[in-house]
């Protein structure tokens, strides 16, 4: 089974491609996490977990869900992580998670996809994003080849920098940066509730037709990037930046 969590659908796209290539079922962790569903999942022997990279590891909400949820029938697990640039030493923590779940760790693969973390970085415009997705195809094909053969992924890079970013920096990043406090709406907001719908942690509700953010945010960027009116800002850091979600690339090419 292919499990995935996603913010702006990079991971959903990769998971769908992998599931199609392996003829495996696809399992949406966003829906489970949003519903608070930790019931056992019948996965079969092989599990592929596809996630974005948050602070140089898999998202904390995913590792927490995995810790609470029995993967019935699972014996082996592969991790596929998409990122804007690097995953650090995420593989070391994925190995620990596999051991915790008593699963054979089959490796971690990194695939570069378009950046969406506009709370800190710049997202590409659609034309550039399409190019990045095209450039990701060889890496995706290598992942599929290994998975079809039941082989381990090659060990990723691991150096002092990687261990530092995934190690001490990760909890510091969550503590000081992963907060919803800076989210706000502009006058363009129409109160459609798309942000409420997309938030995997139920951290947004409408008051007087306007979104209000709570304290339980994972910085997935779904709210700000899916807003149809681009009426959400993250303080001053997102002003003027392109919004990115994968579905926009599947529409008619930009004129």
Residue ranges and their predicted role:
Residues 41-42, 121-123, 220-222, 248-252:
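Short low-complexity, flexible loop/linker segments enriched in glycine and/or proline
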Residues 1-2, 6-14, 20-32, 37, ...:
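FMN-binding flavodoxin-like domain, especially the glycine-rich phosphate-binding loop
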Residues 159-191, 197:
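A mid-sequence, solvent-exposed acidic-amphipathic segment
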Residues 42-44, 73-74, 179, 185, ...:
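Residue-level preference for short coil/turn positions at secondary-structure junctions
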Residues 230-255:
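Long, positively charged, glycine-interspersed low-complexity recognition regions
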Residues 50, 82, 128, 186-187, ...:
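Conserved short-loop catalytic and cofactor-binding motifs
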Residues 184-185, 190-212, 216-218, 222-239:
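Iron-sulfur cluster-binding cysteine motifs and their immediate structural context
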């Amino acid at each position: 089974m292919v499990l995935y969590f996603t913010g702006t659908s990079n991971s959903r796209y990769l998971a769908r491609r992998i599931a199609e290539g392996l003829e495996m079922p696809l399992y949406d962790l966003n829906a489970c996490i949003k519903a608070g569903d930790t019931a056992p999942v019948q996965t079969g022997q092989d599990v592929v977990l596809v996630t974005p990279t948050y602070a140089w590891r898999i998202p904390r909400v995913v590792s927490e869900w995995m810790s609470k949820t029995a993967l019935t029938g699972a014996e082996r697990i592969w991790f596929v992580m998409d990122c804007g640039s690097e995953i650090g030493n995420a593989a070391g923590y994925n190995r620990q998670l596999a051991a915790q779940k008593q699963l054979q760790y089959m490796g971690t693969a990194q695939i570069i996809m378009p950046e969406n973390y506009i709370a800190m970085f710049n997202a590409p415009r659609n034309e550039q994003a399409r190019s990045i997705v095209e450039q990701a195809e060889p890496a995706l094909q290598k992942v599929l080849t290994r998975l079809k053969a039941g082989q381990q992924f090659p060990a990723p890079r691991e150096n002092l920098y990687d261990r530092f970013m995934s190690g001490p920096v990760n909890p510091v990043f969550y503590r000081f940066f992963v907060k919803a406090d800076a989210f706000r709406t502009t006058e363009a907001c129409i109160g459609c509730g798309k942000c409420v719908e997309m938030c995997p942690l139920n951290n947004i509700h409408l008051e007087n037709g306007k979104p209000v953010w709570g304290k339980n945010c994972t910085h997935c960027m779904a709210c700000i990037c899916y807003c149809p009116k681009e009426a959400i800002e993250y303080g001053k850091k997102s002003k003027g930046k392109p919004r990115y979600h994968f579905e926009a690339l599947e529409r008619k090419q930009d004129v």
